[in-house]
Amino acid sequence: MGSGDLLRSVESICSSYVSEGERRAVMVFGPRALGYGSPDDELYVLLVADKLGTGVRVVRERAPEARLSLIIAGRGALEGDVKDGLLGELLADKFLLPYVAVEGHSYLADIERRLKKRLARELLMDIASSFPRIATEMLIDPRYFLYEVASRMGRLMPAAAYAFANLLAHPRSRRKNERRMLEGFLRALRELEGEGLVVREGAFYKPTPLLVKKASRPSILGLLWRVRGAARSISRYALRALYGLGAPYMSERRAFMERFAHLADVNPLSVLPKPEDFLFLRTDIGLRPALKEVALEELAASLELTRGPDDVDMVEIGGTVNLVYLVTVRGAVGLARFIVKYFKDWKNLTWLSLRLWALGAKKFAVSGKERLRREYVMCRELGSLGFPVPRIFHVNLRAGYLVEEFIEGVNFADMLRRFFLGEEEARPVVELAEEAGRLLAGIHGAGISVGDFKPENLIAREDGHLSLVDLEQATRNKDKAWDVAEFLYYAGHYVPSISTAEEFELMARAFLRGYLDAGGSPDVVRKAPSARFVRVFSIFTPPQVIEIVNELCEGGGP
């Protein structure tokens, strides 16, 4: 901003239109006011008048130091635009950018806070409605609100994007202006925290269950938001005809072309940070963007597993309800393997799932988003408690997949098949079965039910111990007896129908012994052979296995 003489000229010109006693506030804005415009640029002035109601007028004046474009807005017009987009936010959006307060400093700061609180709330509701099942796990850098607003405004009215680009495109300018532009958002977030809609975690904010609940109200609310957004867009273009209100945008565009001539043909939004760069989830390798793709070769290098040029192989390894890939990254030095799992909605349930639902024995999570959330949350939670589960390296909520650690080893189900056929020694199988029981008891002791604790989801690692994979059905405080029943009956269906099932009994005793010795509840064991579970598995589990399970579990354990 220029000299004190210029500010005095501004006040004098304002007084010729609205007396000092009727002025609520005066501010200057735009390229000339903020120091990146040319000396020939107009100086833009916003005067807020108490007695003008919802009226708006634009006049041009000349001061000795500069040409002025004076926007005189009634207090009702400005506050209506801030609250409801009354004028397509053609007045309100001036408070998204730095400005110079001439009069009414506290009023202008309050207007900025109110606008940014409303926008932050709307964006938070949008996140919560888009990702309701995992929103409470997301960490939001406050810069997300700044750049998401810039992005949305720039898409509705492309000329508006130049103002943000002028202030934020160059790293040096960004360091100076970003902090100033965030102040109002930070004040707004503190208020939203006081209302219970977000919680602060370090430098980040997390949505709360209350926010998710508010965002899940009848879908007509979302429709109204979209209609209001469309109306704002229409009103922006209609109101450009109002003399002078479109001029500041054209000045910003000219300033951008003069300052960044080499970017003249570039969309100004492309020179700004992407909003999705500021939405995170915690993983076992730190914070990772929640909505972005990941280059697995870069991930392997960051984990220091590979070095040098990479070759990437992707092989589908099954999954009846998900797309699951084993990805191998071979560097000039080193090799890394990852599991990439895409979570689809269960539009066609497997026969077993249908049977479970029909008999009321078990309700599975069907939504792909819900199953991704459970896999992410439970791997993180159980891993933090020391349980042997895969580490999560990356999550992409938009594409519905996660990248997790590949556990090297032998599937325990394969070992059981060979054992029941007499092709595997008893000792390692019995020891691992007992370890499986201890593992399940520990997880139950943490208040978690696995939901899919079948032998296929246990991997015998090279060190001789087990890891548990596929936690997409895990949840808190559900039917723990189902976990015991599924392990035993599912393992039993590998037993040949003509077998005496002695090997199965040996394995089952070891599993139950491990479960009870590690603190598992006898009541849980006693409920495992209940009729509702037996009905589910009786179609493929030999009767001699069912009889053994009944005998071992009826008294609460062998």
Task: Cite the ranges covered by each PLM segment.
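Catalytic activation segment of kinase domains across protein kinase-like and atypical kinase folds
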Residues: 456-489, 493
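Active-site nucleotide-donor binding segment shared across nucleotidyl transfer reactions
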Residues: 11-55
